[in-house]
Regions:
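Acidic, low-complexity intrinsically disordered tails
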Residues: 1, 95-102, 106, 508-516
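Flexible, glycine/threonine-enriched loop-and-boundary segments that flank and lead into catalytic domains
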Residues: 1-15, 19-28, 209-213, 229-230, ...
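Conserved ASCE P-loop ATPase motor domains encompassing nucleic-acid-directed helicases/translocases
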Residues: 1-85
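Short linear interaction motifs
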Residues: 2-11, 112-118, 462
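Active/binding-pocket-proximal capping segment
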Residues: 34-38, 141, 193-196, 242, ...
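Short flexible coil/turn linkers enriched for glycine and charged/polar residues
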Residues: 37, 127, 436-439
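ASCE P-loop NTPase motor cores of helicases and related translocases
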Residues: 46-226, 334-395, 403
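Conserved helicase motor core of SF1/SF2 NTP-dependent helicases
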Residues: 154-156, 163-175, 231-247, 251-516
Length: 516
């Protein structure tokens, strides 16, 4: 039976398909439809619970991490046994944050060598070692990763792909397939799918219980590239199964998970950017456990040191004024736009012609995680932009459509209010987690909280530099921040809080102030 419930405004991170449990922890129902804006949820209830009417439910799905634990224990036992003194090991190089070790050639760039050529050369010459690659917003790290995977396949190597989620794995595999098709190359790809995921065109599917079959496909070369989560690669049967393993979004992939999967490969390539979103956390852990593999390698640096890995210094997304802010605040001034981006700009808006940063102060009080005053300001901004046009990096002039805008907010409660007002216009609204990897003509970041002391998750969340980076770097031409001016005057008690506040304050210093 399908039961419909209404719920009051609240932070909701559930999704369709999630299983719900009442306070006693027993299985109650599964979400079939969820409308966060209207506060309605439809749930499918089994016969045994057909007459049960709980007043509150929660979702908690525990995934066993035993294979990862066992892999790390095997690694630790070997480390305690011989200390890897004579062994060439990607796992040890990762843990020790060693420089990439090559068989023959130099790690430094050769004269006239492009970044892609260097990345491919170094990857093919790795001596059971690691190659970290940091790619800022719009730098093309997925495209580069696909180029490297194709080169590995051409060299006869067995290739694995892993990431924090099935979707990220699929995105990289899709890029490999698209490039291979354009080049006329035959690349066979497979994936160990999630539980309820349907088979995908052009991808050999394996279910979660078919890891052995998937690994056999690598051995007999019926599959050149295999994608799977850490649970696939951490299994003992996967040890030594691939010559090179790619970890995509390694800035969100914990060091512990990376060490667990490393025994599966000869060499390890880590693609990502620790300056964007951090690894998602679903529980309380000891301090330091959540550090990502790339963050560990960076060792406190904002950008990849030249002797530790590769830094992708060009963005193909951000117009010069937006890139200047992003580069200064997050990338040690090392990120630059390609020349074609100088022509990207908004036109025919009457107020926002050109490219750049815009600060929209909105006075309000007493709001913690949602602000109607900001919703109204965002609505006016959206209407102005939808009546304008923009010029892309190829000089093509076009009208700004709803799909050319993104509206970002830190809290789901504020997202719901914004969506209720903007859904009819077709403009996408969400948290930064939804939009990482996406791009648009202009982005609007609405911060919702009236005063720093009101922030529900404290300064670390509301002023997060990672989230500010992702939010403001979605827009090709322009980034708007809509917020209470009181957020510019937090009561900082630590150097870290001063650093967090500096991100927003620096944006405002470089931005044009506008009133709606």
């Amino acid at each position: 039976a399908i039961h419909r419930y209404r719920f009051p405004p609240q932070e909701v991170e559930l999704k369709e398909g999630d299983k719900l449990r009442p306070s006693d922890g027993s299985h109650f129902a599964q979400i079939k439809h969820l409308d966060r804006t209207a506060g309605i949820v439809d749930v499918k209830v089994g016969k045994a619970a057909a007459e049960y009417r709980p007043t509150a439910v929660f979702h908690c799905e525990v995934v066993s991490n035993v294979p990862l634990q066992e892999s790390i224990i095997r690694f630790a036992e070997r480390l305690l046994g011989d200390g890897f003194r004579d062994a060439r090991s990607a796992a040890w190089d990762l843990l020790a944050s060693n420089r990439p070790r090559l068989r023959s050639g130099p790690f430094a760039a050769r004269d006239g060598e492009s970044l892609a050529e260097r990345a491919i050369r170094v990857m093919l010459d790795l001596d059971h070692s690691i190659l970290p690659i940091q790619g800022p917003p719009g730098s093309g790290k997925t495209y580069l990763g696909a180029q490297m995977i194709r080169a590995a396949v051409r060299a006869g190597l067995r290739v694995g792909v892993t990431a924090q989620s099935h979707q990220v794995i699929q995105n990289l595999i899709d890029a490999v397939r698209e490039q291979a098709a354009e080049a006329g190359e035959a690349v066979s790809v497979g994936r160990v799918l999630s539980k309820d995921e349907p088979p995908l065109d052009g991808v050999t599917p394996f279910r979660s219980g078919e890891k052995g079959k998937a690994l056999d496909a690598l051995t007999d070369r019926s599959v050149h590239v295999l994608g799977g989560t850490a649970w696939v690669w951490a299994s003992e049967e996967a040890e030594g199964s691939v010559d090179v393993l790619f970890i995509d979004e390694a800035g969100q992939f914990s060091l512990g998970h990376a060490l667990a999967v490393a025994p599966a490969c000869g060499s390890l390539v880590l693609l990502g950017d620790p300056q964007q979103l951090e690894q998602p956390r679903k529980a309380t852990h000891p301090d330091g456990v959540g550090v990502s593999a790339l963050t560990h390698i960076l060792g406190g640096h904002e950008t990849m040191p030249d002797d530790r890995g590769l830094f992708m210094p060009e963005t193909r997304r951000l117009a010069p004024p937006v890139c200047e802010f992003t580069s200064e605040l997050f990338y040690d001034g090392r990120l630059a736009p390609i020349p074609a981006l100088a022509q990207q700009r908004i036109v025919d808006s009457g107020r926002f012609d050109g490219a750049g940063l815009y600060w929209v102060p909105v006075e309000h009080r007493g709001n913690r995680n949602a602000a109607d005053e900001e919703v109204e300001a965002v609505e006016r901004l959206v209407d102005t932009l939808l009546g304008a046009g923009w010029i892309d990096d190829r000089g093509r002039r076009r009208r700004i459509e709803p799909g050319d805008l993104r509206v970002v907010a830190p809290y789901n409660a504020h997202v719901n209010r914004l969506a209720a007002r903007l859904d009819a216009r077709g403009v996408q609204v969400g948290t930064v987690d939804r939009f990482q990897g996406q791009t648009c003509a202009a982005v609007i970041y609405s911060m919702a909280t009236s005063d720093p002391a009101d922030a529900p998750r404290g300064m670390d969340f509301l002023y997060s530099l990672n989230r500010l980076n992702v939010a403001t770097s979605r827009g090709r031409c322009a980034a708007f921040i809509v917020a209470s001016p009181a957020l510019l005057e937090p009561e900082c008690r630590t150097p870290r809080q001063m650093q967090l506040a500096n991100g927003l304050c620096r944006f405002v210093e470089k931005a044009i102030e506008v009133r709606t």
